[in-house]
């Protein structure tokens, strides 16, 4: 089984915010592959299904971003899986809005959700799909920025990125992550 985790904050008020790019990607996968993400387990909304024949578990932690690792660790423990069985999709301030970057491992890079995952999984070695949200203009607080919605001018870019993230996850069900990474990291915007 492959586990696809999207990071975000629960609740209507955070629904279309920059920090919820991971949740947006899970919603896209859910819609595209007909996998409802409605079960409340592991302090998360989860959905089990198949993508191209491979069993997958879609996960949207409901712990708020900074505690995401607690929920993810519960999922892995219950299913007796290891970090190599998962990919996490999340927002990245250091990428232009709408760009993707896939990595096999790495540091938290200042992202509190990833910091929590590293802490609770005990490793930095898990796959990532970063969705670019750009940095705020000088003088604007980062926390205010990530908790606001995308302006109209950026919505098409973010929807395209979320769609590509969903495609990357589907490809991962049948190919090595290295191959997926090489393909999607080479796409030009």
UniProtKB/Swiss-Prot annotation:
Q: Which Pfam families match?
A: Pept_tRNA_hydro (PF01195)
> What superkingdom heads the lineage?
Bacteria
Q: What is its EC number?
A: 3.1.1.29
Query: Under the GO molecular function aspect, what terms does this record hold?
Result: peptidyl-tRNA hydrolase activity; tRNA binding
Annotated keywords: Cytoplasm, Hydrolase, RNA-binding, tRNA-binding
Annotated compartments: Cytoplasm
Site (Discriminates between blocked and unblocked aminoacyl-tRNA) at: 9
Report any one BP term from Gene Ontology. Answer: rescue of stalled ribosome
Q: Which residues bind tRNA?
A: 14, 64, 66, 112
Give GO cellular component annotations, separated by semicolons: cytoplasm
Site residues, Stabilizes the basic form of H active site to accept a proton: 91
Give the chief site where it resides. Answer: cytoplasm
Name the catalysed reactions.
Answer: an N-acyl-L-alpha-aminoacyl-tRNA + H2O = an N-acyl-L-amino acid + a tRNA + H(+)
- Residues forming the catalytic site: 19
Gene3D superfamilies, sorted: Peptidyl-tRNA hydrolase
Q: Which InterPro entries does the UniProt entry name for this protein?
A: Pept_tRNA_hydro, Pept_tRNA_hydro_CS, Pept_tRNA_hydro_sf
User: Quaternary structure?
Assistant: Monomer.
* PANTHER family to which the protein is assigned, alphabetical: PEPTIDYL-TRNA HYDROLASE
Q: Which family does it belong to?
A: Belongs to the PTH family.
**What's this protein's function?**
Hydrolyzes ribosome-free peptidyl-tRNAs (with 1 or more amino acids incorporated), which drop off the ribosome during protein synthesis, or as a result of ribosome stalling.
Q: State the protein's name.
A: Peptidyl-tRNA hydrolase
Species for this entry: Brevibacillus brevis (strain 47 / JCM 6285 / NBRC 100599)
Lineage of producing organism:
Bacteria, Bacillati, Bacillota, Bacilli, Bacillales
